[in-house]
């Protein structure tokens, strides 16, 4: 739909580069997409999870206007919904909230393998928003001296999302950071600002230790499993899991803080 609009030459070149990139990446990622679908990762999601479909109420954020008319657009890999919200937060000038949301979702789901698809979905979702804005722009008149305020706003949105999509497809700097301290020393508190400042994924030993024993991240592990979760053997398993997950994050193209 975007390519059918009378875009200026600069935006048309950007769009062509993005279309070429998404096609190449889609082909490269196809085996992973197929494998995740076979493993049951595709499920009923929101399908249109941008900030225009989210409201902050007194008891927390509430989603609305999920896609109901098309199962093909609603039954998707959850990382596609996660990417949509992260992308839109960045488009609205709050990438920090996007990184905190992503890390919270990863801790809850444990789906670090899905990070291999994140960049592709980020770009795809930015192009979706550019397309929606482009349709509004095309319907209200093109940019120019006589353009309406609505057309100008739509055109600026097209530019914003195209620019963001082009930025999101670029390789990211990767690195491995380690935080060390005894239990209860404040590692989580101290490293939380770094998650957004450095735009990275954080792996928490206590969360992954609990996951190995079938506990939720917020579960009281001492009360449920006594000392068994903190034996030397359990610690070795936890460290091995952290190493494997750190490798997964780095291979997906993201920095990681352990």
What positions do the PLM features span?
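Conserved substrate/cofactor phosphate-moiety recognition/catalytic segment
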Residues: 192-254
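Conserved lysine of the Walker
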Residues: 187
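Hydrophobic anchor at the beta1->P-loop junction of P-loop NTPases
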Residues: 177-179
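P-loop (Walker A) phosphate-binding loop of NTP-binding proteins
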Residues: 182-183
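Short catalytic-loop micro-motif centered on adjacent basic/acidic residues
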Residues: 256-258
């Amino acid at each position: 739909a975007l390519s059918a609009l009378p875009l200026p030459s600069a935006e048309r070149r950007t769009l062509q580069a993005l279309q070429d990139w998404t096609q190449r990446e889609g082909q490269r990622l196809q085996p992973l997409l197929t494998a995740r679908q076979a493993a049951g990762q595709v499920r009923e999601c929101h399908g249109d999870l941008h900030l225009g479909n989210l409201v902050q109420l007194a008891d927390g954020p509430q989603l609305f206007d999920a896609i109901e008319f098309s199962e093909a657009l609603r039954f998707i890999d959850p990382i596609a919904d996660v990417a949509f919200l992260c992308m839109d937060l960045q488009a609205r000038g709050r990438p920090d909230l996007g990184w905190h949301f992503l890390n919270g979702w990863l801790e809850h789901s444990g789906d670090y393998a899905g990070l291999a698809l994140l960049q592709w979905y980020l770009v795809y979702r930015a192009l979706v928003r550019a397309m929606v804005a482009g349709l509004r722009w095309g319907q209200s008149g093109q940019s120019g001296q006589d353009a309406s305020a609505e057309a100008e706003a739509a055109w600026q949105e097209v530019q914003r999302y195209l620019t963001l999509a082009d930025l999101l497809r670029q390789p990211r700097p990767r690195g491995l950071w380690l935080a060390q301290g005894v239990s209860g020393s404040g590692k989580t508190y101290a490293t939380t600002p770094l998650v957004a400042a450095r735009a990275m994924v954080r792996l928490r030993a206590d969360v992954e230790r609990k996951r190995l024993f079938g506990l939720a991240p917020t579960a009281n592990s001492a009360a449920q499993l006594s000392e068994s979760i903190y034996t030397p053997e359990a610690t070795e398993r936890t460290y091995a899991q952290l190493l494997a997950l750190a490798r997964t994050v780095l291979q997906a193209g993201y920095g990681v803080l352990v």
